[in-house]
């Protein structure tokens, strides 16, 4: 995959966070003074979410200037443009790309998973189920099988779904807590799902067809919520801690090995980018901007 690394000079915040746990012998101590200038003016709505890097290194987010848009920063550019406007009434949340460059978008008001085929700007409904609460975040296996979290915030409950290569949806589990962040590990044999209000991260065994089994508690926090998650190549899980203003890195053994302090308090999602794939971009709802820090390893897709 071609990757990009260029400064977002007008509205993107590069925040090299503070390393909190010295026990990770692979970490480099980072000081908050390493942060670049914070630009408070933002052209995104409070729905800023869905950070993702496409096949050619372009950087994408949702809700530029107004809800219902997908923003793109071209490789080598210093500014975002509106890449597509979603159909009337659709608003994106999570974004993921498959290995051929197709974009998938969780459209929460209309209970859809949307697709934009690589090389086009045509938005189509890839999957739909009216019984969903609201598809929130997405995860994808190397073979293209998708998963979506499906929270019901009012009832503090949620589900997880599988979407196969033909767009058929299968309910994997219901009656969970408020399912939110979701991710597949590098070996494609574990699915992670977090419950924001309940502050728990669950792990499932995953087979090549996207079936899950052997659910177990992977990690539980005692305060604040969670949002989006991503894995690096070593299987470490990067978790946006909504309200805490940090990204926490958890090893495959369930041990917190790093805590990165952000300038904002409400991170909504994370994604890997940069020349080597080791820059973590973080969207923040309260600031309506993006921050970044350097990871020890590239993201799982690099």
Q: What are the roles of these predicted feature ranges?
A:
Residues 14-15:
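C-terminal motif of bacterial Sec signal peptides marking the signal peptidase cleavage site
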Residues 206-268:
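Glycine/small-residue-rich hydrophobic helix-like segments
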Residues 23-46, 215:
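A short helix->beta-strand "capping" segment at the edge of beta-propeller domains
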Residues 81-85, 124-128, 170-174, 213-219, ...:
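Beta-propeller fold detector
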Residues 60-82:
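Beta-propeller domains
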Residues 42-59, 87-107, 112, 129-159, ...:
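Beta-rich, blade/repeat-based domains predominating
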Residues 74-78, 117-121, 163-167, 205-210, ...:
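Short loop/turn segments that connect beta-strands within beta-propeller blades
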Residues 69-71, 112-114, 159-161, 200-202, ...:
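A short loop-to-beta-strand structural motif that recurs across blades of beta-propeller domains
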């Amino acid at each position: 995959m071609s990757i990009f690394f260029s400064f977002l000079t007008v509205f993107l915040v590069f925040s090299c966070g503070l390393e909190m746990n010295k026990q990770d012998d692979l970490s480099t101590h980072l000081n908050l003074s390493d942060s670049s200038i914070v630009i408070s003016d933002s052209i995104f709505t409070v729905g800023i979410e869905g950070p993702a890097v496409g096949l050619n290194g372009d950087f994408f987010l949702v809700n530029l200037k107004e809800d219902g848009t997908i923003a793109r920063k071209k490789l080598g550019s210093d500014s975002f443009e509106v890449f597509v406007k979603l159909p009337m009434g659709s608003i994106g949340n999570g974004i993921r790309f498959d290995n051929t460059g197709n974009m998938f978008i969780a459209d929460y008001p209309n209970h859809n998973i949307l697709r934009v085929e690589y090389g086009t700007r045509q938005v189509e409904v890839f999957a739909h189920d009216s019984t969903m609460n609201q598809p929130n975040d997405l995860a994808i296996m190397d073979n293209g099988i998708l998963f979506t979290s499906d929270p019901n915030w009012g009832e503090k409950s949620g589900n997880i779904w599988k979407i196969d290569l033909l767009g058929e949806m299968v309910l994997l589990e219901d009656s969970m807590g408020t399912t939110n962040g979701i991710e597949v590990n590098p070996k494609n044999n574990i699915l992670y799902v977090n419950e924001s209000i309940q502050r728990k991260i669950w792990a499932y065994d995953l087979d090549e067809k996207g079936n899950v089994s052997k659910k177990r508690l992977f990690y539980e926090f005692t305060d604040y919520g969670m949002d989006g998650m991503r894995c690096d190549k070593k299987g470490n899980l990067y978790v946006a801690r909504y309200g805490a203003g940090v990204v926490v890195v958890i090893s495959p053994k369930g041990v917190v090995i790093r805590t990165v302090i952000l300038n904002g308090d409400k991170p909504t999602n994370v994604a890997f980018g940069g020349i080597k794939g080791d820059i973590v971009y973080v969207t923040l709802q309260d600031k309506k901007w993006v921050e970044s820090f350097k990871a020890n390893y590239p993201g799982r897709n690099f």
